[in-house]
């Protein structure tokens, strides 16, 4: 119900029943949200992670992944779930090596900087970790590869389009949640080589970039 009443759908009236909410949101999105909620409950909160920021970035990454995938004709629901799962890898790192978390979460949070600190401290990124988890859970190989190469999708041979989508989506999420920049500055901060592989045009992105709040207002 909360999702159906969010700014994403822009309804003129308030949705008050589960049936109406499911009709508005769609069964695919409901299934994805249920799975995401279960996965979130499976991992305890870590004291050195800002809980509000963590889940907002997860929802923003999922939302931007869905938007990008739909824009280029990829599987939008698969992209949403892959984008949502990415930061769960950091929670696994927090469980296994809690002493490393304070350094990984060190401020300021420059876009992509957390991946670098994760590698410096553990030898892996959150994407490597959660990619191995979903491999053991028998997720589709496309999702496994996308997560494993999410920090460097160009290293995947052949190129992982889903990995590229999630990479760009996570950068957009970090910029959107943690800073206030114009659409032009936001797009200019993205890696041109990955955008080229995804055949995403700078001008189109600037003109159509969604407000991060359309994704994060359901994250609390």
Per-region residue spans from a language model:
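Terminal helices and disordered tails flanking the catalytic cores of nucleotide-processing hydrolases
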Residues: 192-220
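Conserved alpha-helical "signature site"
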Residues: 1-100, 105, 109, 113-188
């Amino acid at each position: 119900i909360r999702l159906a009443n969010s700014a994403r759908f822009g309804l003129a009236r308030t949705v008050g029943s589960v049936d109406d909410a499911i009709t508005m949101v769609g069964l695919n999105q409901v299934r994805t949200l249920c799975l995401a909620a279960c996965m979130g409950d499976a991992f305890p909160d870590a004291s050195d992670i800002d809980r509000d920021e963590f889940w907002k970035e997860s929802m923003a990454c999922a939302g931007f992944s869905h938007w990008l995938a739909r824009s280029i004709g990829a599987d939008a629901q698969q992209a949403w779930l892959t984008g949502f799962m990415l930061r769960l890898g950091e929670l696994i790192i927090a469980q296994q090596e809690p002493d490393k978390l304070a350094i990984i979460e060190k401020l300021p949070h420059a876009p992509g900087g957390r991946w670098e600190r994760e590698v410096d401290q553990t030898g892996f990124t959150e994407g490597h970790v959660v990619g191995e988890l979903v491999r053991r859970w028998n997720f589709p190989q496309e999702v496994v590869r996308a997560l494993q190469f999410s920090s460097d999708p160009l290293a995947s041979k052949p190129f992982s389009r889903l990995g590229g989508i999630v990479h760009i989506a996570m950068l957009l999420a970090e910029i959107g949640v943690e800073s206030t920049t114009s659409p032009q500055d936001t797009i200019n901060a993205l890696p041109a080589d990955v955008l080229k592989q995804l055949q995403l045009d700078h001008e189109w992105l600037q003109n159509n970039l969604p407000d991060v709040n359309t994704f994060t207002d359901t994250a609390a």
